[in-house]
Amino acid sequence: LINLGIYDEVKETLEKNGKSLAEIEEIELEPSLGNGGLGRLAACFIDSIATLGLNGDGVGLNYHYGLFKQVFENNLQKETPNPWITKESWLTKTDITYPVSFGGFTVQSRLYDIDVVGYNNRTTKLHLFDIESVDESIVGDTIDFDKDDIKKNLTLFLYPDDSDDKGRLLRVYQQYFMVSNAARLILAEAEAKGSNLHDLADYAAVQINDTHPSMVIPELIRLLQEKGILMDEAIEIVSKVCAYTNHTILAEALEKWPISFLEKAVPQLMPIIRELDNKVRAKVADESTYIIKDGLVHMAHMDIHFGYSVNGVAYLHTEILKNTELNNFYKLYPEKFNNKTNGITFRRWLMSCNPELSAYITELIGDGWKKDANELEKLGNFINDDAVLTKLVDIKNAKKAELASYLKKT
């Protein structure tokens, strides 16, 4: 409503009819697509892309139950499914569908879209792929389900329990399902715009947000080979298309999968991954940078070697990556490393969450900040203004009281 410019009008109309926006917000279910750091960042990316009018979309999976809903019974935590998909949801079913092959079986995908409205600008899309054969009935009152039945469970839960091999293997299936669909959608859109695929980098850029989508690199190479492009050129093309965002300073926390998992789930990718590893070994002496090592496939290593950019998400984080944790890679590719400091969409976290503070900021510096966050620096002019500081504290206290009241109710 804020981005459409009709928030105040809708609020006023509801109040005239004895309703409030807060009541409506409680009725509408929040999409259970990931509310952690990566999910929040992805949502902010898409809002920013739409607001800036850039050509960009998000791609993910249409998780039916998200992570879980936390309830307390007898003073103990209990995890239950968190369903959100209803006929009133913002999901739009499309005609786009692809067969996705795993080791020994194939599933059929279906693309659903959610429109993301920019602030006084364009609308972009969040593409969410689902499987046609998903079966919610295999989930009961808890978050336990048959992890072996991939044809039914693939898109049920975000981050399925990975305390055993079945859960970890399910994550591999999920990751490949996402990137295989995304890669084909990207190639189809590029061809529709006139690309001959040899020039794919002129039509597409793929941002690998942490290592979960890393298999998009070998999958794009595989699909380009299916289109008649030879392996070496396909690798060169993909290396100009893919970029990697790192979110951890601990090298040991970087995602790596047992070769046996990939050979079982996505055997078609292993020859390509082995060839990528061979190319690294042919030009690099440092064994710590190899893609395949000790029976594991190191996803971040593949991203760094065969992507055009590697960024951290804060200045200090990026410096640590360059100087310690990924220093061996930095020595190989100093030109690839750069910093992109994480931000937030202040339209959600300020204008939506705190309209009183937003109104006061506009009163002080005008409304240019709503599209350009740099305008907020003008608030520095009031750093010694007691009246302004008192007003800010009053607003803050009022919002704390609102939060306390909400927490008491829930």
Can you name each region flagged by the protein language model?
Residues 1-410:
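A conserved ligand/cofactor-binding region detector
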